[in-house]
Amino acid sequence: MKNYLIEIKKLSKNFLHSSSQHSTYALKDIDLAIPAGCIYGIIGMSGAGKSTLLRCINGLEAPSKGDILIEGKSLFQKNPAALRAIRQKMGMVFQHFQLFSSRTVAENIAYPMEIGFISQVFQEERINQLLNLVGLEQKKEIYPTSLSGGEKQRVGIARALANHPHILLCDEPTSALDPKTTRSILQLLAELNQKFGLTIIIITHQLETVKQICHRVAVLSEGEIVEEGEVKQVFIRPQHQATRHLLHLDGDQIPVDLIQQRNPDKLLVRLGFEGNQAKEPIISQLIKQFDIEVNILSGGLDYLQKTIVGNLFVEISGLPQNIQKAQAFLKSKQIICEIIL
């Protein structure tokens, strides 16, 4: 039986409009099971419900119906002591750092331990451990105004780890950072996951974040989970239109003038590759073996952690029987051949 650390069951959240009796659903019947030790991404467009879902997971927002179980125990039980014990198992990393400007780095990290009545001796020991862990040993007595964005987020991560949480909740942890700093923060999160078996949930709209470190991903659209699975499977073979749109696999990145000027007798096709397939001369093989014309409109190669993946949008024309043979050839190579128009 799989060890699920977090189980979200039929979770819904609606907000009642003050000016009327009508309500709007922010979340609708969310079902998710997140394994222990997983780096789990939740992605979606703005307004999809990501932030509301995170607020429910950390207990700041009560659902209209449904439940969230942390290690088998309900997050919404009425016993204050039991609820406090569950919430102490979670640490929170914020988009805009949320550091106290009047406190030093060490004092910011100490804050969760102070409100948890942890002894001063233990606090000092833990602060030193965490500073070493996030690579800020030399910044202990520095104030946040003297830190870079990446350093501030490292302080935020250290603070979130202060009370030895089992779960790290990250709300857009890299969206305020430049690409190089983003990679270093994601690498730190991956190292924490590997070293401590920490379960990490990342709310993000940045596909690169999910590509770089997430094991599994859920796609949220209009308050509903429309797709969920291993990152490679979801990104290479998306099933839902919302996912395809997020990943730019519906042809929306092809210049409008090319779409308007294209010959309607030609097929607009997406070719999807992974691993060694991306290294093969597929286009030249199609042209030579099947006597068809293939015109590349857009696309390129990318990486999903250590796996090469590629997507090409091409126009294909030729005799129908030759195109059918080419499609069969692509299928035999396990290359995605999806007709867009």
Curated annotation (Swiss-Prot):
Pfam families, alphabetized: ABC_tran, NIL
Family matches, as InterPro entries: AAA+_ATPase, ABC_transporter-like_ATP-bd, ABC_transporter-like_CS, ACT-like_dom_sf, MetN_ABC, MetN_ABC_transporter-like, NIL_domain, P-loop_NTPase
Gene Ontology CC: plasma membrane
Keyword list, A-Z: Amino-acid transport, ATP-binding, Cell inner membrane, Cell membrane, Membrane, Nucleotide-binding, Translocase, Transport
Subcellular location, principal: membrane
PANTHER family, sorted: AMINO ACID IMPORT ATP-BINDING PROTEIN (PTHR43166), METHIONINE IMPORT ATP-BINDING PROTEIN METN (PTHR43166:SF30)
Family: Belongs to the ABC transporter superfamily. Methionine importer (TC 3.A.1.24) family.
Protein name: Methionine import ATP-binding protein MetN
Protein source organism: Protochlamydia amoebophila (strain UWE25)
